[in-house]
Amino acid sequence: MNRTISALKEWLNPDWARHRSVPPFEAGLRPNRRLDEGTTLLPEAQFEPDDVVIRDTGEVVFSSGDGIFTLTDGVVTRVVTLGGQVGSLLVAEDRMIAAVEGVGLVTIDADGVATDLCTDAELAACVTDLTLLPDGIVLATIGSRAVPDWSAALVADDRSGRIVRVDGSHAEVVAEGLGWPGGIENAGAGEVLVSLGFDHRVERRAVTALGKAGAAVGSNLPVYPGRIATCTDGWWVAAPYARNRFTELLLDEPDLLREMTATIRQDQWFVPRLRCPDPYTDTLQLGQLRVHGVIKPWTPPRSYGLVFRIDQRGRIAESVHSRADSDRHGITGVASRDGRIVVAARGFRNLLEPQKDNER
């Protein structure tokens, strides 16, 4: 009914039409080349890091495939192999907590011994992020309960995402009906930051009222925000995907969307990706402009590399980019300690330490 009314209003007066728009990268999100000029930390194409954390000792720990690895002085060591794809990581004192697809939450002690923490069905799939509260409670975001694949959930406008409270082996759903909550982080004062990917929004919610909509910290972002990590002067937010006008147009047309999903294989859908290995064969090339075979950095990206920092006042203070003409894309995790930043570029299949100069 709403769709019919909208179509009728647009027919009567085109100026009444309301369509999705993509805001520009500006102010704190002004494009730069800090990821492109940063340092790669892993051997090329040997890993596909999903998340990363930095311990108090400065040791870098990351997840890739079914394992957890450490990186010390350029040497990568496998810590443990788990029973499924390892995603989000969390440091909790002298142990680690990992989300394992098909299993749930697993703890890994200092000796690398893994023990099941919570194997509740709510945590068995699509855990996107974890955070630890001061009282020892773990909060987990579930991207989707019904459609655990990101691109399929996007075109379905899925709203089955949840926040789950984990106390030992007990799990309790404390928020539901969310549009792909991709990140959560303790913000102090009894609050957490939550990123809502399909709403292009980061918001602050009270721990005692996680089921209620919170105050926007960043809204109508030009990206789909993901995992969040605390730093000394705010929070870093990973943005695995950037929005583009082609996809937004598609999402405004349900009939066209249904035809696409029914007639085109999923890897060719006109939606953002973590990486775009051969952009020259992309259908319609998403409107990208090429001169002499060169992709321009300002073109509509199918894949993009970005993390941005929100300061204590809730403003986007800085960001690091890898633009459309590069390949250091698909940033799924970020960690910061003592001024050092390390990002997990799953699309690029490496860990990156961004260039420090924000003017580049």
Give the residues covered by each predicted segment.
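A short beta-strand motif characteristic of beta-propeller blades
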Residues: 37-44, 74-81, 113-120, 170-175, ...
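Residue position within the beta-strands of beta-propeller blades
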Residues: 62-63, 98-99, 139-141, 193-195, ...
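Short, conserved, GDST-rich strand-edge loop motifs in beta-rich repeat architectures
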Residues: 140-158, 240-302, 353-354
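A short helix->beta-strand "capping" segment at the edge of beta-propeller domains
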Residues: 7-8, 18-48, 73-75, 306-323
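Beta-rich, blade/repeat-based domains predominating
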Residues: 45-55, 83-95, 122-137, 145-146, ...
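Blade-level signature of beta-propeller repeat domains, shared across WD40, Kelch, NHL, RCC1
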Residues: 242, 330-360
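Short loop/turn segments that connect beta-strands within beta-propeller blades
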Residues: 71-75, 109-113, 166-170, 206-210, ...
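Asp-box/WD-like beta-propeller blade repeats and closely related beta-sheet repeat scaffolds
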Residues: 99-133, 140-161, 175
